[in-house]
Amino acid sequence: MYFIGIDLGTSACKLLLVDEAGAIVNEVTHEYPLIFPHPGWSEQKPEDWWSAVVTGVPELLRGFDAELVAGIGSGGQMHGLVALDAADNVIRPAILWNDGRTSKEVDYLNNVVGKDKLSSLTANIAFAG
């Protein structure tokens, strides 16, 4: 029995194939570029993430019986924005967690609402990305 782990990170998609004892039996990494269209901005194409998964999973399973995969777990970078249209198509590059274009708005929220109050209301901190 095997389990697949997929990590859609900021710089790459990392895939692991783990056996039932928890040992890593195969791993694959597909890097994708960061886009910096303006100073302080940080974006990526969500299509690159999907391509990395679609390409990476068959590579990960090469030489292994896919029928023995019992589960898949995935995780990814947090605090990003993927804008979709009404048909769920991506309409622009994703704005990443490390994008700084809204730092003035974050400062405003922290000053007017307060960091602690904002965190208690949203269960999160205000983030520029």
Predicted regions and their residues:
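Glycine-rich phosphate-binding loop and adjoining helix at the ATP-binding site
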Residues: 54, 82-129
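N-terminal glycine/serine-rich phosphate-binding loop of ATP-dependent small-molecule kinases
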Residues: 1-92, 119-120
